[in-house]
């Protein structure tokens, strides 16, 4: 059974909407849960697609279809404590976007769902529960 609330990051969203191998497990983990993410999620999703364009991993048409699928996922975007995020960024030596996700998990006392290894490791260093994708 999924936790009541789950913080989801762009790597997990991208894995779902681009039909990556983790997709079925990610969907199972989130069934029945409220998904939340920092306000930065749409920017991160867009950045992920632009990176895929540069690596020739996705066409514009497929990216637009994936974005349409993303827009159908019910994810509540939320503000975070920017001061706390900066503290986390400094303490954990991570980018602000990763710190936003960890701050969101701490603020809502909710586990983090990610397929990003470095983010997973940083979250665990401050005792944020990370949902495992099996």
Model-derived regions: residue spans:
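Buried hydrophobic packing segments
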Residues: 13, 45-49, 104
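Active-site-proximal, substrate-binding regions of enzyme catalytic domains
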Residues: 46-76, 80-82
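Active-site neighborhoods of divalent-metal-dependent phosphate/nucleic-acid chemistry enzymes
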Residues: 72-118
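Short, well-structured N-terminal submotif of metal-dependent ribonuclease cores
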Residues: 1-40, 53-64, 126
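Acidic, PIN/NYN-like endoribonuclease modules and their adjacent C-terminal/linker elements
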Residues: 1-5, 38, 102-134
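A general structural signal for well-ordered alpha-helical segments in protein cores
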Residues: 10, 23, 42, 46, ...
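General small-molecule cofactor/ligand-binding pocket signal
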Residues: 36, 76-78, 131
């Amino acid at each position: 059974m999924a936790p009541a609330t789950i913080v989801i990051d762009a790597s997990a969203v991208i894995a779902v909407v681009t039909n990556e191998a983790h997709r079925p497990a990610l969907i199972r983990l989130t069934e029945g849960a409220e998904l939340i993410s920092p306000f930065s999620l749409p920017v991160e999703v867009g950045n992920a697609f632009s990176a895929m364009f540069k690596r020739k991993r996705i066409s514009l048409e497929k990216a637009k279809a994936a974005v349409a699928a993303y827009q159908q996922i019910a994810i509540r975007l939320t503000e975070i404590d920017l001061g706390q995020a900066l503290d986390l960024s400094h303490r954990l030596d991570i980018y602000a976007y990763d710190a936003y996700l960890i701050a969101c998990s701490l603020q809502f006392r909710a586990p983090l769902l990610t397929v990003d290894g470095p983010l997973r490791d940083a979250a665990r260093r401050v005792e944020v529960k990370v949902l495992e994708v099996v």
